[in-house]
Regions:
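N-terminal small-residue-enriched
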Residues: 1-272
């Protein structure tokens, strides 16, 4: 079961939209739709009369609505097909530190009532809980039987296919474990920075990790939300992003890939 909601808020010279999306195994886990609608409407109104900011470097908080995109980037770089092509910036990082030592990222196909749970992959390889990142260290690359043979690795049980396609490499329930510092505390700690609530577009070079995405959200000044912002470009390098990333304790399982809100230091923000 799933839902998607989109709300438009407008004034005479300005219009903004807010959306929410959630997917669960059981309908009764989707939540209170009236509350979801009210919250979405309030968030759309908060976005009205957004401003542009000057180009600068600052700390950035990726809200939990968008932080899973960083795990999608991590998965793409850890996909054995990318490794075989030699175009991953993580190709030589197995058993090396990629995140700080407090971070662990798990792929667990055996979780109850989760979207991508399974007992085996599509090639019959037994599914097991595996740490992709354990205490900051990269543990494995996702593979299928074919890509495992090409890399001379053991199969990890991550083959997936539709009825009409050949097996390809995928994940099961991939998530980053909770951190200790709340999003509210993160906001309070920032003198000037950005809370990202929406990402759009993508320009990511997986050969070297260069990262650039369009974004909108809210500007933070002196530890408080100051005003809505839009038409921003966030730029950095994924190795630097991963190494400085700090997760909050607000993980929710709403999709196949899930992550809590994340604070990342010293990213370039392109504005006016």
């Amino acid at each position: 079961s799933d839902y998607i909601i989109a709300v438009l808020a407008g004034s005479r010279n300005n219009m903004e939209r807010e959306y929410d999306y959630k997917s669960k195994i059981f309908f009764n886990e989707l939540g209170d739709f009236e509350k979801i609608g009210r919250d979405c409407s309030k968030n759309a109104i908060k976005k009205l009369h957004s401003k542009k900011i000057k180009t600068c470097k600052s700390d950035v908080i990726f809200d939990s609505k968008v932080s899973a995109s960083l795990l999608r980037n991590l998965f793409a770089a850890c996909n054995s097909q990318t490794i075989i092509k030699g175009i991953s910036f993580l190709k030589n990082k197995i058993e090396k530190k990629v995140f700080n030592s407090e971070i662990s990222i798990v792929d667990n196909p055996l979780m109850q009532k989760k979207l991508r749970s399974r007992v085996s992959d599509c090639e019959g390889i037994e599914s097991k809980k595996k740490f992709l990142i354990k205490n900051g260290i990269l543990q494995f690359f996702f593979n299928s039987l074919s890509s495992a043979r090409q890399l001379n690795n053991q199969p990890t049980g991550h083959a997936s296919r539709s009825v009409s396609s050949i097996p390809s490499v995928s994940y099961s329930n991939l998530y980053m474990k909770n951190g200790k510092i709340s999003k509210k505390q993160m906001i309070k700690s920032i003198k000037k920075g950005l809370l990202v609530t929406e990402l759009m577009g993508s320009s990511i070079n997986y050969s070297n990790g260069d990262y650039s995405r369009g974004a909108s959200g809210f500007w933070i000044e002196n530890g408080e939300i100051s005003f809505p912002v839009s038409e921003i470009t966030i730029a950095g390098n994924l190795l630097d992003i991963f190494s400085t990333l700090i997760p909050a304790p607000d993980l929710e399982f709403n999709y196949g890939i899930n992550a809590p809100s994340c604070l990342v230091e010293n990213l370039t923000l392109g504005g006016k």
